[in-house]
């Protein structure tokens, strides 16, 4: 599975690398879990609604969320990370 970040999500992800290694480890664990289990697993995955229909969210901690979308099936499946900080905007 390919893992891609939007420019904003990559900026947020690299910010965690500098600011909080514990949170970064949690994000990395979630990404691995998504690769293995899809839309089930750690972080209380939930589908988003309205404008964000088709996206999923997982709780990094009380304040921050990992927002992502799985595209495709099988070997061609792609994980796109849209956000890895505070609630949806």
Feature locations, PLM:
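Enriched for short, Lys/Arg-rich terminal
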Residues: 2, 11, 15-24, 58-65, ...
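PIN/NYN-family metal-dependent endoribonuclease catalytic core
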Residues: 5-6
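PIN-domain endoribonuclease scaffold, especially VapC-family toxins
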Residues: 24-32
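Short alpha-helical linear motifs
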Residues: 29, 49-52, 68-71
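A short, hydrophobic secondary-structure junction motif
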Residues: 31, 37, 85-89
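A short, surface-exposed loop/turn module that caps and links secondary-structure elements
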Residues: 32-58
